[in-house]
Amino acid sequence: MSDSQQSITVLEELFRKLETATSETREGISSELSSFLNGNIIEHDVPEVFFDEFQKAIQSKQKALNTLGAVAYIANETNLSPSVEPYIVATVPSVCSKAGSKDNDVQLAATKALKAIASAVNPVAVKALLPHLIHSLETSNKWKEKVAVLEVISVLVDAAKEQIALRMPELIPVLSESMWDTKKGVKEAATTTITKATETVDNKDIERFIPKLIECIANPNEVPETVHLLGATTFVAEVTPATLSIMVPLLSRGLAERETSIKRKAAVIIDNMCKLVEDPQVVAPFLGKLLPGLKNNFATIADPEAREVTLKALKTLRRVGNVGEDDVLPEISHAGDVSTTLGVIKELLEPEKVAPRFTIVVEYIAAIAANLIDERIIDQQTWFTHVTPYMTIFLHEKTAKEILDDFRKRAVDNIPVGPNFQDEEDEGEDLCNCEFSLAYGAKILLNKTQLRLKRGRRYGLCGPNGAGKSTLMRSIANGQVDGFPTQDECRTVYVEHDIDNTHSDMSVLDFVYSGNVGTKDVITSKLKEFGFSDEMIEMPIASLSGGWKMKLALARAVLKDADILLLDEPTNHLDTVNVEWLVNYLNTCGITSVIVSHDSGFLDKVCQYIIHYEGLKLRKYKGNLSEFVQKCPTAQSYYELGASDLEFQFPTPGYLEGVKTKQKAIVKVSNMTFQYPGTTKPQVSDVTFQCSLSSRIAVIGPNGAGKSTLINVLTGELLPTSGEVYTHENCRIAYIKQHAFAHIESHLDKTPSEYIQWRFQTGEDRETMDRANRQINENDAEAMNKIFKIEGTPRRVAGIHSRRKFKNTYEYECSFLLGENIGMKSERWVPMMSVDNAWLPRGELIESHSKMVAEIDMKEALASGQFRALTRKEIELHCAMLGLDSELVSHSRIRGLSGGQKVKLVLAACTWQRPHLIVLDEPTNYLDRDSLGALSKALKAFEGGVIIITHSAEFTKNLTDEVWAVKDGKMTPSGHNWVAGQGAGPRIEKKEEEGDKFDAMGNKINSGKKKSKLSSAELRKKKKERMKKKKEMGDEYVSSDEDF
């Protein structure tokens, strides 16, 4: 008897024993059968007949239990034989059907067998196994079968995590449907399985939101909130099929929501995520769900701005998915389809005349190959490792490898290939060759881009304003760029002229020496090389100009033995001579440099390469700036001189009645002293100052000197212990605290637009309503008991209701309480009727009712139409002046804003009411260099007064004229030009507001032109016409305003 015939005989005997086995002998026979099958059976003699009988036994009621136990044993074998694996996977549909059996023992045995198969199968053969499980979920009406299959999928996720990640687009819809099953057990199992499956989503941007995304599948009411949460997310990680499979259900529902804001936010997320898709084939399966929703919204949304955002997302989706304007969806690649690879392998095997009994094995090989194509694994050795063991079942190894290599090449040729930009080859030592992504706040700057720097080369870093050039430089210097060499491997120094103010009193030599860069002799020698004289080396840093500070920073970097210099706008503070010196130095020092500059002439003279921002990538061009512009003409506009990355603008202050010049005091403090209760001495004492629209004041002094206390009294946050504080009735002060975020900390879940609407919804600034100068205290209550003698009766003021002009001041309409039996035990005060209201002059009221008068002044100012409407568009326009775009203002929650964006929001909110004075407490603490430059320019151009508390002389040097030096509670002013009356200078005329005017509630104010007075001749003419009409019409005549 031959070996093969003997094997078949043994199998038949074992199978017969298995059929008749009892519960006591079942395990032993199953184990023996498993060992024999996975042993040394001749590959060409695959026991086809045995497995046919095996399949029938699984379906049999009498034999199922024993056979399922054997399946588990065969699959649990440590080394599952390649000749057995395809056949054992082929039993899965039959085993699945038994997992729903009413017989509990059979159901448990089937579940155990399925889990054993899922654990044992080659991970790359997942495309052979998973379709069976999905088909069972889709077609079965047995809830136990569904629960078992869901548990098996969880096991398969652990066994083949990378492969399941690629199958998520077909897996998630089926699991989602199971989550809506009517059976509670299926729902729970589906939720557990989909949670397990999402472990394959390797995307740091969304991983913390995955529980919410799963919750949205089960509960669609959660969609709006989840879209809001994701809308504040910065997407920087590559978007894969697994990521889209879990995101697209949410986004497609978001596009179909009723609220326009949710539709818009969903479009923003689609736009941001699609930019991170590397391969059009990744997004292709999802185009059918996203494209129609975006098109429909673009056609039906009424809000123009939301339609514009939707159109932007639509364009991005079309570009990434290679969709034409006709919106015909491109064909999805079938390179990784099992049917495609099966066709190729069958064609190659045709000359070998492979027997029909190996069909299951050939189909299994096609499934493995399809998975390798999906994973984009194309190297020969990996294909040999995964596929050869199955090919040698019916071919000799040499023939198998020859056919397999041909199979690999033909299968790989079917993969669609996108454009590939190779870095220009260049000889030299690599200092850096890394791939990374970069974001700032909620904005993606770079996505999976390469940066390669060679020793001794000079690179110009170029891109449009806001592309993130300085952010990239700072990120490299701070070690935040993935893959960039550490300081131990490659010393990188960020050269900036803004030397920290804490070192301003140190000498130049001591400052460089404090950086541990060498001995003082070495440092002195190097500084002299850079042009420093002996006298300058001993000078304090504060006395150096910006240009010399730049040279000092460069000398310190060179002494640190830098391999790479990062230069951010190095020519900003240099004169022509020093620019030429810097050009010569960089060209001859041999140090690699990366330069950001708007000086095109400087870049032309220095750079050997231009690194340019293109579509979230860095692309390198050989040559200087002129050569680069020839290759990329559209880049010319980026590098015009004077280009500014950031600009702020403050609104023009409202008109102040009685203030004819900018020199007239609008805030005046005389002999003011303030002492906190319980302290032994005043915090500030005997302080006198005044502020006008032309004030540019720097408040300086050591910590604890009383600067902030002084400002708090000025702004009304605190009331003085003694002294006088006068503020113009309609003067508005914007105060940005040292801890700027204090203004918005309790509103993080609002959008910036909603925050501003909340803050000013009554017309008043709700942030200032708790200021001490607006709260009625005990002294105020006592003063308000003052008795006025009016029309012979004693009265107390009950309320103040309106204001009108009276000579050079104002008078106020007051309601009263009438006094009866004053001074007696039966004394009482009775409210009087409104007909008894009377007008009292301001000077008389202010002594006892100053805070009530201030409230009326505020309300009158609000009614004057000097405030804009609290509409979304108006708020967006205002915030745009402070560098916040409409996307952030109306559609992003404050919680998701970066630190710099939050500060801009605080600036925007504080200046909403067009303040006359802007007070900033330590702005350099919370604004970066770019924003400080923009703020400095805006404050210079501001038409109101500016008061700044700061330690930074650099910031205030060219901005302020007046200095208040605070020390030990005393304030010494200098540079001031205080005047008693209106003062000199050009007169301020009240300007007529252009365009429509609104009150604080958004109601349009119709301000008609004032009628001119008629002359006596015109009046006589009007009278004659009136008499003529009366005579002609008789009793029918009715006069009108036009007749007079």
Swiss-Prot record:
- Protein family: Belongs to the ABC transporter superfamily. ABCF family. EF3 subfamily.
This protein's assembly is summarised as: Monomer.
Name one process (GO BP) from the record: cytoplasmic translational elongation
Q: What does this protein do?
A: Ribosome-dependent ATPase that promotes the translation of proteins required for detoxification of reactive oxygen species. Required for the ATP-dependent release of deacylated tRNA from the ribosomal E-site during protein biosynthesis. Stimulates the eEF1A-dependent binding of aminoacyl-tRNA to the ribosomal A-site, which has reduced affinity for tRNA as long as the E-site is occupied. Assists translation termination by stimulating the release of nascent protein from the ribosome by release factors.
Chief place where the protein resides? cytoplasm
Induction note:
Increases in mild (0.5 mM) hydrogen peroxide stress, and decreases in stronger (1 mM) hydrogen peroxide stress.
Species in which this protein is naturally found:
Saccharomyces cerevisiae (strain ATCC 204508 / S288c) (Baker's yeast)
Intervals holding HEAT repeats: 5-42, 86-123, 124-162, 166-203, 205-241, 242-279, 285-323
Q: In which pathway does it act?
A: Protein biosynthesis; polypeptide chain elongation
Phosphoserine modified-residue sites: S974, S1039, S1040
- Organism placement in taxonomy: Eukaryota, Fungi, Dikarya, Ascomycota, Saccharomycotina
Pfam families xref list: 4HB, ABC_tran, HEAT_EF3_GNC1, HEAT_EF3_N
**Which residues pair up as cystines?**
none
Query: Does the keyword Hydrolase belong to this entry?
Result: yes
Q: Which CDD domains match?
A: ABCF_EF-3, CD_eEF3
Q: Which residues form a coiled coil?
A: none
In Swiss-Prot or TrEMBL terms, this protein is called: Elongation factor 3B
Q: Which reaction does it catalyse?
A: ATP + H2O = ADP + phosphate + H(+)
Q: Which UniProt keywords apply?
A: Acetylation, ATP-binding, Cytoplasm, Elongation factor, Hydrolase, Methylation, Nucleotide-binding, Phosphoprotein, Protein biosynthesis, Repeat, RNA-binding
User: What EC number(s) has UniProt assigned to this enzyme?
Assistant: 3.6.4.-
- What are the boundaries of the region Disordered? 975-1044
Q: Which residues carry this modification: N-acetylserine?
A: S2
Extra remark: Present with 125 molecules/cell in log phase SD medium.
Q: Which residues carry this modification: N6,N6,N6-trimethyllysine?
A: K187, K196, K789
Q: Which residues carry this modification: Phosphothreonine?
A: T972
Q: Where is the composition biased (Basic and acidic residues)?
A: 987-999
